[in-house]
């Protein structure tokens, strides 16, 4: 080309820039003029005469000092999703969003932003590559990953190339399309036709980069990826699908995006071992091998191990321990959350799910789908008339084209799946029950190694047994083995935290050093002799403490390093075991033998040496850390969860049962026969001799008022379940009307209160281990006894919402005042001993009960216990108990209370009334002791640290009459006075 021609081109460029400026001034978009300018450049570069090497692409008008262009209007870009960009080529084609997929068009628009951020005016191929690589979850990144190329290295190479390109500083007229950008899009159109697609997609653009001599070819050479490798990666990602809409990228590798390969996790050893559940796994395999409706659904309570059954199946598939129809299959867990997330427009969710189902169908039965919480497919994606996931799955589930395993809880299965009969019949139920305590212990033993490896601690077998037993008894509302596993996990985490934290001994020394250092700074300013002596002594103490701190730190670091070393060896051993399993599966016996008899033996020897070193250090007495989880740790965690004292949890069950009478008699005075009957019923249950399908015991307490019937129920609740709150008290005087009976099990549908549950059923559902006390049962309406019949016989009640509430872990106590006059008259009119009279009196009282209660109700009660009236000796013991309670309350006011035996007898005589039992005693103490002490405290007669004596004095009334006793309160001068019966 001659110099005159070149000057002519420059003049035309200046005129185009001026036209763009005029368009800008008139409020019109300069896009077409700039695009035409780029088109001229590409035309001259492609089909015209050859440009000299010094000729730069026209970028604007020619100025005196260089190329000057007016700035573009704010917030304007070369490509806008709603605008078309025209460039002049031999085909005079046009860039429109309608010919690109959404992700490809985002890349085209993003290339302009990449150029602007790089301060470059010409948008070239490298900017397009950068935009495609920066797309989150973009198709370009997935294709490069599939080809084995690190996306970071591709982006880094692209950035380096961009940084070498010339930058434009100062005012510019906006970005311009470069020739390489144009050729990339042209070649992408050709590849679109090659694939018989309807839209230009990201993979077409990547194929076009292999023909770009300016940037793309060199990039792929540096990455060592050829065109064939790129085509294979694209085929692996998109499979056999065609681009028929503008969002095909979301459907590529749908299973990989929206599913988790459980067989791959099992192959890599990422799944926990599954202990037991062989029957359930075998049943699932049996259903999966059917011709049609080969879809098991695992139902059970939350935490019993439904997902673990699917994991166990995945592990068996990897091991080859399955029938031929399931050999070498993949078990994919569908992530419904990922499937729904980001589906903004109607139809997107259905497209994703159809893509997943299409991949499963294309696998010809090689893929088994697992949907955890399968009830979520009912209604999922159904909005504005769209079909939900359940309806999309139904045809394939029925024909056997899709083998699907579901898992859900009983309540959600009933609430969602059973309502859709067409969906329910396509699934076959596999019930997963709660394992027994013995099975839970086996499961924990199987999981122990995994938790030891994760936390870097040891877990004793006693801790596992304790976790299963204590969780089964005290943690209600959850199910085994989940709650037992959580106990072990939390106890191990607590111990690990203690190991990594500073030991208490070292922490105390550190704090003491800080305190002495501060005291030393304070003493340095004093010049008196005592301060100097104190300073010298303090410096000596500091020196000693710092030496101790150094020794303790060294011991701690050494012990911690040994534990870390043991943990790393165990992790390496676990990795080697996985490699051995993989080698044996692939029949690489040389590799397996090398690992098993070489590497593994070496690791075991290293582990033994490290453990011996740790044991020697611990036996030397220098150890500051604990590495084993024991049953005490488990009991502490249970105590934190439930509030039950640790000492009660650790006390053996046998010891507690043997001492049952003594414990009950601490609060229940007298009533030896009643206490013994209750203790025998509880021991019978705990020994496993009672019916497991009935309550622990159902007892009826009959006797006069105030003799300890309700108190025995409270004491029994505290003994059995370590808290008095475990007593559920139902006052039957509130259920005298017929309409009030429904409050026990909940209001029926249509009535106010439906859905809130019943007072009895909800209380037992929340606290299954409890004592249920029906107080004054004879006052209840007759319909109440109809409810109690099934409770006493079957140990269960169905509430108003159809939920079955179990009473098999409850003690049922009913109190009644029937026969009270008979009991009092019998004892008052006989001189025989209580034991001799008891059986006759009991028979007479039961005969009276038969007149009030129906035979079918009385026949279901385990034992009738008749309480006897209290005598003076027992009343005096109750007085002592009540005075000790007053004493404890006064202790909070820092006032000490003591009393004499005479005072106890006097109060007992005043409060004794066989007709009213022990209740008058409380009133007498309240009037004669508590009122007087309160008055004296307010007057100032009794102050803090005073000792108050409750005594009796004799008062003469008149000559010839015996003096009367009077209760007196006096402040003791000598607080050390020895008195009897004060504790």
Curated annotation (Swiss-Prot):
<dbReference type="GO" id="GO:0042026">
    <property type="term" value="P:protein refolding"/>
</dbReference>
<dbReference type="InterPro" id="IPR028299">
    <property type="entry name" value="ClpA/B_CS2"/>
</dbReference>
<dbReference type="InterPro" id="IPR004176">
    <property type="entry name" value="Clp_R_dom"/>
</dbReference>
<feature type="transit peptide" description="Mitochondrion">
    <location>
        <begin position="1"/>
        <end position="87"/>
    </location>
</feature>
<feature type="coiled-coil region">
    <location>
        <begin position="504"/>
        <end position="627"/>
    </location>
</feature>
<dbReference type="GO" id="GO:0016887">
    <property type="term" value="F:ATP hydrolysis activity"/>
</dbReference>
<feature type="domain" description="Clp R">
    <location>
        <begin position="97"/>
        <end position="240"/>
    </location>
</feature>
<dbReference type="InterPro" id="IPR041546">
    <property type="entry name" value="ClpA/ClpB_AAA_lid"/>
</dbReference>
<dbReference type="InterPro" id="IPR017730">
    <property type="entry name" value="Chaperonin_ClpB"/>
</dbReference>
<dbReference type="InterPro" id="IPR050130">
    <property type="entry name" value="ClpA_ClpB"/>
</dbReference>
<keyword id="KW-0547">Nucleotide-binding</keyword>
<feature type="region of interest" description="Repeat 1">
    <location>
        <begin position="100"/>
        <end position="165"/>
    </location>
</feature>
<dbReference type="InterPro" id="IPR003593">
    <property type="entry name" value="AAA+_ATPase"/>
</dbReference>
<dbReference type="Pfam" id="PF02861">
    <property type="entry name" value="Clp_N"/>
</dbReference>
<dbReference type="InterPro" id="IPR018368">
    <property type="entry name" value="ClpA/B_CS1"/>
</dbReference>
<dbReference type="Pfam" id="PF07724">
    <property type="entry name" value="AAA_2"/>
</dbReference>
<dbReference type="Pfam" id="PF17871">
    <property type="entry name" value="AAA_lid_9"/>
</dbReference>
<dbReference type="GO" id="GO:0005524">
    <property type="term" value="F:ATP binding"/>
</dbReference>
<feature type="binding site">
    <location>
        <begin position="300"/>
        <end position="307"/>
    </location>
    <ligand>
        <name>ATP</name>
    </ligand>
</feature>
<dbReference type="Pfam" id="PF10431">
    <property type="entry name" value="ClpB_D2-small"/>
</dbReference>
<keyword id="KW-0809">Transit peptide</keyword>
<keyword id="KW-0496">Mitochondrion</keyword>
<keyword id="KW-0067">ATP-binding</keyword>
<protein>
    <recommendedName>
        <fullName>Chaperone protein ClpB3, mitochondrial</fullName>
    </recommendedName>
</protein>
<dbReference type="InterPro" id="IPR019489">
    <property type="entry name" value="Clp_ATPase_C"/>
</dbReference>
<keyword id="KW-0677">Repeat</keyword>
<dbReference type="InterPro" id="IPR036628">
    <property type="entry name" value="Clp_N_dom_sf"/>
</dbReference>
<dbReference type="GO" id="GO:0005739">
    <property type="term" value="C:mitochondrion"/>
</dbReference>
<comment type="function">
    <text>Molecular chaperone that may not be involved in heat stress response or tolerance.</text>
</comment>
<dbReference type="GO" id="GO:0034605">
    <property type="term" value="P:cellular response to heat"/>
</dbReference>
<dbReference type="Pfam" id="PF00004">
    <property type="entry name" value="AAA"/>
</dbReference>
<dbReference type="InterPro" id="IPR027417">
    <property type="entry name" value="P-loop_NTPase"/>
</dbReference>
<feature type="region of interest" description="I">
    <location>
        <begin position="255"/>
        <end position="503"/>
    </location>
</feature>
<dbReference type="InterPro" id="IPR003959">
    <property type="entry name" value="ATPase_AAA_core"/>
</dbReference>
<feature type="region of interest" description="Repeat 2">
    <location>
        <begin position="177"/>
        <end position="240"/>
    </location>
</feature>
<feature type="region of interest" description="II">
    <location>
        <begin position="629"/>
        <end position="820"/>
    </location>
</feature>
<keyword id="KW-0143">Chaperone</keyword>
<keyword id="KW-0175">Coiled coil</keyword>
<feature type="binding site">
    <location>
        <begin position="703"/>
        <end position="710"/>
    </location>
    <ligand>
        <name>ATP</name>
    </ligand>
</feature>
<dbReference type="GO" id="GO:0005737">
    <property type="term" value="C:cytoplasm"/>
</dbReference>
<comment type="similarity">
    <text>Belongs to the ClpA/ClpB family.</text>
</comment>
<dbReference type="InterPro" id="IPR001270">
    <property type="entry name" value="ClpA/B"/>
</dbReference>
């Amino acid at each position: 080309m001659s110099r005159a021609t070149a000057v002519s081109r420059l003049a035309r460029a200046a005129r185009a820039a001026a036209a763009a400026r005029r368009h800008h001034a008139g409020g019109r978009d300069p896009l077409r003029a700039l695009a035409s300018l780029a088109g001229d450049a590409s035309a001259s570069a492609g089909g015209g005469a050859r440009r000299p090497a010094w000729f730069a692409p026209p970028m604007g008008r020619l100025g005196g000092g260089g190329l000057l262009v007016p700035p573009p209007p704010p917030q304007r870009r070369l490509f806008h999703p709603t605008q078309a960009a025209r460039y002049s080529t031999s085909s005079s084609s046009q860039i429109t969003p309608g010919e690109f997929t959404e992700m490809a068009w985002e890349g085209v628009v993003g290339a302009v932003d990449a150029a602007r951020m790089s301060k470059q005016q010409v948008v070239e191929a490298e900017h397009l590559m950068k935009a495609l690589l920066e797309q989150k979850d973009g198709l370009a990144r997935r294709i490069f990953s599939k080809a084995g190329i690190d996306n970071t290295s591709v982006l880094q190479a692209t950035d380096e190339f961009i940084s070498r390109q010339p930058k434009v500083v100062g005012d510019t007229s906006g970005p311009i399309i470069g020739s390489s950008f144009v050729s990339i899009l042209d070649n992408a159109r050709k590849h679109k036709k090659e694939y018989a697609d309807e839209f230009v997609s990201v993979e077409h653009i990547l194929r076009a980069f292999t023909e770009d001599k300016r940037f793309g070819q060199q990039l792929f050479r540096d990455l060592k990826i050829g065109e064939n490798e790129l085509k294979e990666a694209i085929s692996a990602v998109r499979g056999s699908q065609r681009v028929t809409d503008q969002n095909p990228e979301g459907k590529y590798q749908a299973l990989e995006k929206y599913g988790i390969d459980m067989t791959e996790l099992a192959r890599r050893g990422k799944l926990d071992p599954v202990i037991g559940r062989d029957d359930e796994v075998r049943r699932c395999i049996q259903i999966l091998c059917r011709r049609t409706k080969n879809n098991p659904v695992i139902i059970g309570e939350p935490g019993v191990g439904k997902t673990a059954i699917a994991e166990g199946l995945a592990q068996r598939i990897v091991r080859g321990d399955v029938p031929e129809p399931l050999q070498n299959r993949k078990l994919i867990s569908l992530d419904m959350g990922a499937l729904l997330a980001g589906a903004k427009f109607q139809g997107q969710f259905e497209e994703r799910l159809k893509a997943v189902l299409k991949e499963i169908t294309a696998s010809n039965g090689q893929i088994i789908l697992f949907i955890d919480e399968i009830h979520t497919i009912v209604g999922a994606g159904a909005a504005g008339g769209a079909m939900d996931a359940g309806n999309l799955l139904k045809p394939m589930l029925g024909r056997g084209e899709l083998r699907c395993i579901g898992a859900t809880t009983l309540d959600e299965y009933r609430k969602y799946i059973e309502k859709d009969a067409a969906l329910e019949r396509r699934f076959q139920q596999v019930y997963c029950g709660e394992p027994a305590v013995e099975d839970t212990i086996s499961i924990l033993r199987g999981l122990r190694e995994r938790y030891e490896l994760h936390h870097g601690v040891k877990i004793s077998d006693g801790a596992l047994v304790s976790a299963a037993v204590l969780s089964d008894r005290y943690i209600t509302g959850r199910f085994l083995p989940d709650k037992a596993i959580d106990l072990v996990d939390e106890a191990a985490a607590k111990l690990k935290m203690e190991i990594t934290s500073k030991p208490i001994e070292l922490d105390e020394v550190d704090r003491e050093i800080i305190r002495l250092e501060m005291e030393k700074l304070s003493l340095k300013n004093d010049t008196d002799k005592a301060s100097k002596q104190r300073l010298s002594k303090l410096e000596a103490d500091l020196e000693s403490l710092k030496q101790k701190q150094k020794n303790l730190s060294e011991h701690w670091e050494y012990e911690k390093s040994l534990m870390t070393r043991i943990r790393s060896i165990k992790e390496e051993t676990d990795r080697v075991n996985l490699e051995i399993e993989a080698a044996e599966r692939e029949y690489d016996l040389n590799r397996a033998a090398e690992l098993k008899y070489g590497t593994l033996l070496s690791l075991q020897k290293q582990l033994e040496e490290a453990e011996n070193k740790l044991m020697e250090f611990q036996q030397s007495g220098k150890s500051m850390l604990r590495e084993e989880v024991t049953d005490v740790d488990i009991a502490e965690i249970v105590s934190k969860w439930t509030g039950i004292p640790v000492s009660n949890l650790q006390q053996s069950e046998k010891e507690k049962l043997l001492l049952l009478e003594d414990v009950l008699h601490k609060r229940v005075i007298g009533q030896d026969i009643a206490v013994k009957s209750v203790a025998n019923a509880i021991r019978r249950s705990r020994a496993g001799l009672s019916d497991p399908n009935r309550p622990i015991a159902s007892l009826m307490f009959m006797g006069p008022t105030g003799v300890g019937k309700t108190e025995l129920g409270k004491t029994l609740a505290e003994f059995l379940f370590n808290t008095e709150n475990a007593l559920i008290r139902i006052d039957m005087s509130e259920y005298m009307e017929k309409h009030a009976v429904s409050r026990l099990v909940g209001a029926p549908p249509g009535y106010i209160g439906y859905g809130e549950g019943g007072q009895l059923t909800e209380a037992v559902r929340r606290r299954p281990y409890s004592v249920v006390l029906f107080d004054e049962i004879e006052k209840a309406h007759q319909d109440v006894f109809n409810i109690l019949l099934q409770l006493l016989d079957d140990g269960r009640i169905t509430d108003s919402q159809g939920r079955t509430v179990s009473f098999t872990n409850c003690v049922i106590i009913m109190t009644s005042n029937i026969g009270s006059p008979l009991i009092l008259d019998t004892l008052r009119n006989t001189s025989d001993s209580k034991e001799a009279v008891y059986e006759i009196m009991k028979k007479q009282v039961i005969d009276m009960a038969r007149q009030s209660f129906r035979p079918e109700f009385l026949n279901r009660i385990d034992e009738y216990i008749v309480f006897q009236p209290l005598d003076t000796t027992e009343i005096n013991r109750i007085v002592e108990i009540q005075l000790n309670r007053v004493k404890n309350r006064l202790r909070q006011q820092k006032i000490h209370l003591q009393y004499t035996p005479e005072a106890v007898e006097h109060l007992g005589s005043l409060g004794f009334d066989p007709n009213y039992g022990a209740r008058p005693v409380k009133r007498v103490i309240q009037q004669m002791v508590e009122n007087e002490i309160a008055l004296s405290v307010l007057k100032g007669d009794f102050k803090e640290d005073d000792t108050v004596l409750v005594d009796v004095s004799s008062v003469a009334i008149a000559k010839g009459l015996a003096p009367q006793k009077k209760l007196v309160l006096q402040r003791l001068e000598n607080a050390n006075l020895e008195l009897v019966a004060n504790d």
